[in-house]
Swiss-Prot record:
A matching Pfam family: NB-ARC
Limits of the HMA domain: 1188-1252
Localization terms from the record: Cytoplasm; Membrane
SUPFAM superfamilies: P-loop containing nucleoside triphosphate hydrolases, RNI-like
GO terms classed as biological process: plant-type hypersensitive response
Family: Belongs to the disease resistance NB-LRR family.
Function comment: Confers resistance to late blight (Phytophthora infestans) races carrying the avirulence gene Avr1. Resistance proteins guard the plant against pathogens that contain an appropriate avirulence protein via an indirect interaction with this avirulence protein. That triggers a defense system including the hypersensitive response, which restricts the pathogen growth.
Organism listed in the record: Solanum demissum
Protein name per UniProt: Putative late blight resistance protein homolog R1B-11
Domain NB-ARC: 684-736, 786-830
Keyword tRNA processing (UniProt): no
UniProt keyword list: ATP-binding, Coiled coil, Cytoplasm, Hypersensitive response, Leucine-rich repeat, Membrane, Nucleotide-binding, Plant defense, Repeat
LRR repeats: 955-980, 998-1026, 1077-1100, 1103-1125, 1126-1149, 1187-1212, 1213-1236
Amino acid sequence: MIEIWKSQCTRILSISPDSGIQYWKKTESMKSQYLEEVGVALDSFVYWKEVIWKTKQEFRAEYSFPKTSLAANKVIDDDDINIDSLKFVKEVINVFVGNINVLVKINDPRSWFFVPGLKEQIEQVLKEFKLLRFFVCFVSNKCIEPQYRCSTFYSHVLIEASHIAMVVCLHLPIYGNGNQDLAPSEKMIDIWKSHCPDSFPYMKVISKTNVIIKTLYVDELRSCPSCNSYDSFDNWKEVIWKTKQEFRAEYSFPKTSLAVNKVDDVNTHSPKFVMEVIDVFVGNLNVLVEINDPSSWLFVPGHMKEQIEQVLKELKLLRFFVCFVSSKCIEPQYRCTTFYTLVLIEASHNAMVVWLHLPVYGNGNQDLAPSEVSRLFSDFMEMKIKSIEPGISRNSIYIDVLQALKSTIPQAQKKQLDIPTHSLTVGFSGQMANLQEMLCLLRDNLIHLPILDLEFHLQDMDSVIVDAGLLIYSLYDIKGEKEDTVLDDMNQALGFDLPRNIEPIKAMVYLVMQKAFHCNLPRIHGLGYVDFLLKNLNDFQGRYSDSLAFLKNQLQVIQTEFESLQPFLKVVAEEPHNKLKTLNEDCATQIIRKAYEVEYVVDACINKETPHWCLKCWLLDIIEENTCIKAKIQEKNTVEDTMKSVIARTSSQLARTPRMNEEIVGFEDDLLLALLRDAIGEGSVRRELHANELSDMLRKTLLPRRYLILVDDVWENSVWDDLRGCFPDANNRSRIFGPSHPMLGPPKSKLPTHQMLSTGREVGEQVANNLGTHIHNDSRAIVDQSYHVLPCHLKSCFLYFGAFLEDRVIDISRLIRLWISEAFIKSSEGRSLEDIAEGYLENLIGRNLVMVTQRAISDGKVKACRLHDVLLDFCKERAAEENFLLWIKRDQTTKAVYSHKQHAHLAFTEMDNLVEWSASCSLVGSVLFKSYDPYFACRPLSSHAFAVSHILLNFKFLKVLDLEHQIVIDFIPTELPYLRYFSALIDQNSIPSSKSNLWNLETLILKRRSAATYKTLLLPSTVWDMVKLIYLYIPNFSPENKKALFKNSPKLDDLETLSNPYFARVEDYLSETVDHLKHLEVLELYRVEFGDHGEWKVSSGKFPKLKILKLDYVSLMKWIVADDAFPNLEQLVSLGCQNLMEIPSCFTDILSLKYIEVDICNKSVVKSAKYIQETQVEYNQNTNFKLVIIKKLVLKFDRFHGDEEIRKRLSSLPGIKSISINRGEKKLTVGGDVDADEVRLVVGKLNKRDML
């Protein structure tokens, strides 16, 4: 055996030679030496006990199982592996099995091989050896891969088997000459110490008890050396009883909550050790249950024996569940370490309770009363596995166990159904299917449940997971070796009442689903979300009436409730900042969160992803919570009415008290007083002066001086308007600052700090030296205060700017379309969403939170804007904090996916990030792709377009998908029913037609690559099925199926913007299709061919709501318009229409017309435009009418340094439409309604500063 061991172990194991070989060698040497000295025959082993005992004692000190972990050598040479390796492993295990069998069969106490107290454990080891051998045979016979792939596995099997054999050998009890080997209790303590954390208080109890018992035993032997010590226990009762009384006072189970130490060693709490410990406890309890002799000091009365039997049954089930988890968990076992530790703690608690409260009768001393013991056992039964301390993550444990449970249910179900004699209920199959569905839901939702939210439900979660595991395990025999009696015990304990056992699991599934959904909701919402929900509810109930039939009544109630709450949301959207603002915002937030929930429930019902019982329960809870919200709003309204009445009475009293009114006037003028006192000295100004007198005094004081004034804590534009007249403009480079604002400049300037300071270098340097650090440190607090006073409806709009890149100009029309699609805009009767959104934007501009970079020449509306870097950083940070917006950049790894909650909106900078994160973004509402690389869209199509169509399926609630200018696509997504905004880049000439489910899409923007701009794009007929389409912008497109366009054009009643269609015979399509779009507001025709004659006839009453008409390089010659066509037209733009004879004279009668722009047109068009202007202004008194004739100014330059500064300076001039710089020809071309002198003045200043 030693020779075989040497030949194999040096090749397979890392031990050369192993301590086992050393042990056998030294034993043989000692045997030979002893025989030579005493001359005793080989079969005279009487004196060998002393030798062997000493030898084992020596090796026990060196051999530290199970702390020693031997590593198997990596086998490099495949030829070095032969079939003898597997054969050798089986031979070694067979030798061990044979030796252990000898130990088990010896029952003579006189034999030195007799094992008195460890036989049950050795039998268990024997069983494990046999199973290990069978498994090795199974692997060798069934593995398809070459055997050398399993060499490492064989090596580990060999190591473990050798370890077990060495432990049995080293700790084999040997009696003789007064030398006793390690007692079972001491062995257990050693193993316990090596495995368990030092913080367990019951370790002290066990150690101290063992010392007391050992001392008693030695004293007994000394006092009575000739008597049988095993029968001399009468005097021990009193000592043991007192000892337990002492420990009971210190041990407070179940009140003690033990913290689980962090385990660094994966082998520390192995399932094998846990099961061994439970086996010891089960064995001890079995002894108590089997003793029926009342005279025995271990006798337990019947009323307590029943409880011990119940605890015994629970321990057996717990042991089986540990075995189940260790066998079935797919993830590595170290992920379940905390679970095993918990089981170990609870099993140890149970054993300690039994020992401490074991009734001891004798000498008049009676242990704890039966009623108290009953209570202790009841506490244990209810507690089962107790929660660990907060902060320890166990998502992974739950998910692993649930995965194992879910995969085992079909096997358990098949196993039980194959047994015809089993007492199952009729609905067993259905109940098991329900259980599997619930566990699947529980696992999927746990993945997205943050740790902090999970900790609130740890105890309930533990109970549910364990109950589910025991229930399923009782139906499935893992190893096929459990005795029928054990299985019957478990089935009897569970009662096979599946509905009753499933109920707590149902409750937990519902709780976790709700919690997982709630934790991913944003804390900032758009007030228009309820509007979209109400529209969708009607559409969903019409489209999916069969799927939603069982929820019809609940949905109708919810719809009515939300409609009744609409007036309140409208008030919140229009109210200014006031004392009740917080209460209103809280109620509005709760309402919108309920709207999110309803949308989720309806979608889950349609897609059959959640059980009906769960969805119905959820809707009933929503109805109840909406009722509570309405009651809170009613209470708030009552308080508000009371406050208004008090204010009204106070105002009337103040009106009757002139003296008090004077004091209030003086109080309101504190700002002017402070400015005057700083300017002319303290105490020189009287408070009794009125505002106009103070203003005049301040103006006169400042007029002859050069001043720098800093005004803090001013938040209203009206205050700046009142102060403006106090600051004379003497052209002496004086400055006014408002440090509390992010925009520090003169009133109404709206300039950021760096732009204002650039106009005065001396002032800028002084401010930078004296105030720079202070402003930098306080910038976050300043912006935070500005954000805090924002009304509820503006917060989401402002934070949304965080989705844009730094130093980028933001197109207003695009921004407003995004706001509307995100449901940030609350509808109001009589106003369009676009008008309301523009009002929101002007409000933000008025608060100096947004900078205007370009205004329209026609009506002065904002066309482009941007944010200061400080404000942009704030938006990104605050949006992430509010679970509103998350930027996912290039350096974020996949590992971070599950560390974040699902945010409402995601901004990506790399296509790879989108692919990696898509699997965890099922609840995300918006995806906006941004790229710092301006050439990103010019990359080959295959580099980033291939994955888009696949990953979009994961974003089931997607409402905004903005890939504009970044991602090239060759398709239109069709399975996103909630999508309202879609923009992308395309370079195909056609888009494949497929069935579309985009019935909510409102904005469709498809832009072309520069190389493909002039190619005609064929749109599939499914585009015309998008019945809610409002904004359609696709350069140079043509319908693929003309008949489909004619047929479906009446469905597009909501279409308001149609940009750049291409028609081969435009007179047919415009008359038969486009002019039927009754709600069309914007029509842009780009390079349209108007047939051979170039004629376009617009009949009476057509385009009733059209506001903007743009003709861009069309081949139009003769334009005939009926008198009552275009009744609401506001803007007409003619660009590059060089063949057009004139603008029809009927435009002089359109009273709504405000603006005409003519660019690159012939003189007759310019003449007709001037005639329309003259008529509109003089005869129609339309003073707001404006005519812009685009002119071009070309300037030569000799030197050129930076075009960004030039564009920036010239763009600030009014009327500038285009700026072109030609380096080769040294030309600067400026187009628009420009003032040539102003342009030359700016260019001259730049020349002086060496910019040109």
